[in-house]
Each structure stands twice: as C-alpha cells, then as structure tokens.
C-alpha cells in the first residue's frame, strides 16, 4: 500500500488545524511559526524511516580473535514516539550477541537502536526489530535485546502513572534455546 506523502505546506496546515482544535490561535505571536518548527522537528524525530538497517550493519569484521562468549552493549539511551497516542517514550536498550563468523563496530548497535526509535513505535515491536535485524545481518549464534522504558501515554494521560517502567525482551538463537545464556544476560542487565 502506497501512501501519498503530503507536502510540507499541507503538514503545516494540519498543525494549524490541531492548534485551533485545542482552542489556540495559530496566528498569535508565540504560535505563528510553530507549524514550521513542528515540521522541522518531526523530520528529525522521525528520521528513522529513511534509515537502511542493512547499510548500517554492512561493515563487518571477520577477525573475532577467537572470541566465543557474548558481546553486549548496555544502556543505549533512546526516545521514541508511541504509535497509539503519538506521545514519547524513553528508556534504555541492552543488546548482546554471540558472534559466529563476524563482529560489528559497537556504534553500529547504537545506530540501529536510533533508526528504529526514530519512527512511530510500540516497545514490543521495536525490541523484536532490533534483535531480528542483528540476527539477519550478522548471523550470530544468538541475540538478546532488553528494553526498559517510561511511557508518556501512561504518565500524561489515562492512569497517570509516572514511574511505571515497561520491560520487553526478545531472544534469538542460543539465547532463545539455552536458559543459561538468557540468565547471564538478564543478570548483567538487571543492574542497569
């Protein structure tokens, strides 16, 4: 299904409509340039749609130095937007993988988190997307991903719970098959 992308001017008019919907005057001094600022910020906030995960992970190193344990990158900070309410959720991602024939520069793991976070998301889907993209592109023995996040849709509206942390995990390969690897990963990340 192809979606016709509106022009910037149509998007700005949509922001003006929302401002009128909440009872504001989009032409008053403080709001006059708000549509421009919102569209510019949305281009950055949602820039993940333009990112190619395969390109991010294409530079691999085959010399693993006979490393046979797991590699982890913990505490990758992110902010994304919930696709249900278009409100932000923020937290940390922990990624581990057990290399088979190659490794990747650790900054690449942070880049794929950013690529998926800078889209409308749900945390569950983002957890799977990160794990599966590492699995598909690096072909490791297994991948583990844990995301812990605070959701504005819980703190700013509805149940008004501002300290509730949602945790999601996804495992592939040896992490999915062998509890000892999951246990080690969870012990490592539970202190973070």
UniProtKB/Swiss-Prot annotation:
Binding annotation for Zn(2+): 82, 85, 153
Gene: folE
InterPro entries from the UniProt entry: GTP-CH-I_C/QueF, GTP-CH-I_N, GTP_CycHdrlase_I, GTP_CycHdrlase_I_CS, GTP_CycHdrlase_I_dom
Protein family per UniProt: Belongs to the GTP cyclohydrolase I family.
Protein name per its UniProtKB record: GTP cyclohydrolase 1
GO molecular function, one term: GTP cyclohydrolase I activity
Pathway terms, separated by semicolons: Cofactor biosynthesis; 7,8-dihydroneopterin triphosphate biosynthesis; 7,8-dihydroneopterin triphosphate from GTP: step 1/1
A biological process term (GO) from this entry: tetrahydrobiopterin biosynthetic process
Complex and partners: Toroid-shaped homodecamer, composed of two pentamers of five dimers.
Segments traversing the membrane: none
GO cellular component term, pick one: cytoplasm
EC annotation from Swiss-Prot or TrEMBL: 3.5.4.16
Catalytic activity: GTP + H2O = 7,8-dihydroneopterin 3'-triphosphate + formate + H(+)
Keyword terms of this UniProt record: GTP-binding, Hydrolase, Metal-binding, Nucleotide-binding, One-carbon metabolism, Zinc
UniProt cross-references to Pfam families, sorted A to Z: GTP_cyclohydroI
């Amino acid at each position: 299904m192809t979606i016709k992308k509106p022009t910037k001017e149509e998007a700005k008019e949509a922001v003006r409509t929302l401002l009128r919907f909440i009872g504001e005057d989009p032409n008053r001094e403080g709001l006059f340039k708000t549509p421009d600022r919102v569209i510019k910020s949305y281009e950055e906030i949602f820039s993940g749609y333009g990112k190619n995960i395969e390109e991010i992970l294409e530079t691999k190193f085959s010399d693993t130095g006979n490393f046979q344990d797991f590699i982890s990158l913990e505490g990758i900070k992110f902010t994304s937007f919930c696709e249900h309410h278009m409100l932000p959720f923020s937290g940390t991602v922990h990624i581990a993988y057990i290399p088979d024939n190659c490794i990747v520069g650790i900054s690449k793991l942070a880049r794929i988190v950013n690529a998926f976070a800078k889209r409308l998301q749900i945390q569950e889907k983002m957890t799977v997307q990160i794990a599966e993209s590492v699995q598909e592109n690096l072909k490791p023995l297994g991948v583990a991903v844990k995301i812990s996040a605070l959701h504005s849709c819980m703190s700013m509206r509805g149940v008004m719970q501002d300290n509730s942390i949602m945790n999601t995990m996804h495992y592939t390969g040896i992490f999915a098959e062998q509890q000892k690897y999951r246990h080690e990963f969870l012990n490592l990340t539970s202190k973070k």
